[in-house]
Amino acid sequence: MNRTTSRQTTSSSSYKRMFGGEGRPSVGMARSTLSSRQYSSPVRSSRMSYSVSAPPSIYASKNVRLRSSAPMPRLSSDTVDFALSDAINSEFKANRTNEKAEMQHLNDRFASYIDKVRFLEQQNKILLAELEQLKGKGASRIGDLYEDEMRDLRRQVDQLTNEKAHVEVDRDNMGEDIERLREKLQDEMIQKEEAEHNLQSFRQDVDNASLARLDLERKVESLQEEIIFLRKLHDEEVAELQAQIQDQHVQIDMDVAKPDLTAALRDVRVQYETLASRNLQDSEDWYKSKFADLSEAANRNTDAIRQAKQEANEYRRQVQALTCEVDSLKGTNESMERQMRELEESFGCEANNFQDTISRLEDDIRNMKDEMARHLREYQDLLNVKMALDIEIATYRKLLEGEESRITTPMPNFSSFNLRESMLEARPMIDNLSKKVVIKTIETRDGHVINESTQNHDDLE
């Protein structure tokens, strides 16, 4: 009796776990009300065989089959075999015990399935709420943020493109200026080479003029020495002639008596004086002409040298100015090229940063789409599991209803041993167990549902 009460309590608690309250009478209660009949029934009980196959896939169905074991034996009203009745009662008792244990096991499994279904329903609700939140707010907000970010990036790219175009125009203008300055530099270098060539030729002319001046100075010195020598010689000759004339005058004075000799000497003296004065005049004229020529040549060479020196100084100043200008232009060119390289590097770095930002945003969008698709797949899997569990719950509910209907069926009383001659044949408690399979197909693409279909199949066993 205690064992029967504990079984009733276990059955009642499992039923409460399954259905959450007091509804229909439990299986254990039905069994306890009919426990007094199981020893007086001569009818062979049909053995229930439950076959529950787990779903191999998402859309697999649960099959629960009820089979009767063997046809009921025919009983004759003429003979009563008490041994057969005891055997039938023992077998019925064993079958009922096995059925109770099996039903208790099934009730426990059903309770665990109910808990699992409730947990999965809670998870399903949470995932549905997250999915609705992602669909309603997250997607639009992310889309708006993505569009805003893309607009900003496009605007920055356009701005950078315009700045790059301006920089390229400035670079082209600078390139043209550099080419023009390079051409000017080439012209100045050519002029510098020509000036250096002219300076070299002028230096040669100056050297030649210096050599000519030195030659002329040496010639002037030699001529001056010659003039001095000639003057000295002339003075000596004049002195000699004067001495001779003085002697002749003395002799003439002394020799007054010789008139012809005096006249001859006077004629000779006149001739010599005339010749000496003419020679002196010629020498002075030649000296003056030579000195004038040399002075003129020296002055001319001095002017040429001074002009050459002035031109050389002018060319030297021009070369220095052009060298300074070339150095300044080279510095300007190097600074412009350095600025252009820095601008290109900065623009390249900014373009790479923007490209990395765009790639990162695209990766984030792709990851969010993948996550949404994964949530949709998980949601679909949970829906499939829920449908499978609903099918299994419905099957177990029908099984329990059939078991309750079988248990609550009134059993015949064999206490009076009034047996009819008609043959009793046990029929299965549940002739046909209908099985309803619902197949729901959802097609998604890029995280969006594009097609959804539901198929209902009724199958009878």
Swiss-Prot record:
<keyword id="KW-0175">Coiled coil</keyword>
<dbReference type="GO" id="GO:0005200">
    <property type="term" value="F:structural constituent of cytoskeleton"/>
</dbReference>
<feature type="region of interest" description="Coil 1A">
    <location>
        <begin position="92"/>
        <end position="127"/>
    </location>
</feature>
<feature type="site" description="Stutter">
    <location>
        <position position="347"/>
    </location>
</feature>
<comment type="function">
    <text>Vimentins are class-III intermediate filaments found in various non-epithelial cells, especially mesenchymal cells. Vimentin is attached to the nucleus, endoplasmic reticulum, and mitochondria, either laterally or terminally.</text>
</comment>
<dbReference type="Pfam" id="PF04732">
    <property type="entry name" value="Filament_head"/>
</dbReference>
<feature type="coiled-coil region">
    <location>
        <begin position="92"/>
        <end position="127"/>
    </location>
</feature>
<feature type="region of interest" description="Disordered">
    <location>
        <begin position="1"/>
        <end position="52"/>
    </location>
</feature>
<feature type="coiled-coil region">
    <location>
        <begin position="150"/>
        <end position="241"/>
    </location>
</feature>
<feature type="region of interest" description="Linker 1">
    <location>
        <begin position="128"/>
        <end position="149"/>
    </location>
</feature>
<dbReference type="GO" id="GO:0030424">
    <property type="term" value="C:axon"/>
</dbReference>
<dbReference type="GO" id="GO:0005737">
    <property type="term" value="C:cytoplasm"/>
</dbReference>
<feature type="region of interest" description="Linker 12">
    <location>
        <begin position="242"/>
        <end position="264"/>
    </location>
</feature>
<keyword id="KW-0403">Intermediate filament</keyword>
<dbReference type="InterPro" id="IPR006821">
    <property type="entry name" value="Intermed_filament_DNA-bd"/>
</dbReference>
<dbReference type="GO" id="GO:0045109">
    <property type="term" value="P:intermediate filament organization"/>
</dbReference>
<feature type="region of interest" description="Coil 1B">
    <location>
        <begin position="150"/>
        <end position="241"/>
    </location>
</feature>
<keyword id="KW-0539">Nucleus</keyword>
<dbReference type="GO" id="GO:0005886">
    <property type="term" value="C:plasma membrane"/>
</dbReference>
<feature type="region of interest" description="Coil 2">
    <location>
        <begin position="265"/>
        <end position="403"/>
    </location>
</feature>
<feature type="coiled-coil region">
    <location>
        <begin position="299"/>
        <end position="403"/>
    </location>
</feature>
<feature type="region of interest" description="Tail">
    <location>
        <begin position="404"/>
        <end position="461"/>
    </location>
</feature>
<dbReference type="GO" id="GO:0005856">
    <property type="term" value="C:cytoskeleton"/>
</dbReference>
<dbReference type="GO" id="GO:0005882">
    <property type="term" value="C:intermediate filament"/>
</dbReference>
<dbReference type="Pfam" id="PF00038">
    <property type="entry name" value="Filament"/>
</dbReference>
<feature type="domain" description="IF rod">
    <location>
        <begin position="99"/>
        <end position="407"/>
    </location>
</feature>
<keyword id="KW-0963">Cytoplasm</keyword>
<protein>
    <recommendedName>
        <fullName>Vimentin</fullName>
    </recommendedName>
</protein>
<dbReference type="InterPro" id="IPR039008">
    <property type="entry name" value="IF_rod_dom"/>
</dbReference>
<dbReference type="InterPro" id="IPR018039">
    <property type="entry name" value="IF_conserved"/>
</dbReference>
<feature type="compositionally biased region" description="Low complexity">
    <location>
        <begin position="1"/>
        <end position="14"/>
    </location>
</feature>
<dbReference type="InterPro" id="IPR050405">
    <property type="entry name" value="Intermediate_filament"/>
</dbReference>
<comment type="similarity">
    <text>Belongs to the intermediate filament family.</text>
</comment>
<keyword id="KW-0206">Cytoskeleton</keyword>
<feature type="compositionally biased region" description="Low complexity">
    <location>
        <begin position="35"/>
        <end position="52"/>
    </location>
</feature>
<dbReference type="GO" id="GO:0016363">
    <property type="term" value="C:nuclear matrix"/>
</dbReference>
<feature type="region of interest" description="Head">
    <location>
        <begin position="1"/>
        <end position="91"/>
    </location>
</feature>
<comment type="subunit">
    <text>Homomer assembled from elementary dimers.</text>
</comment>
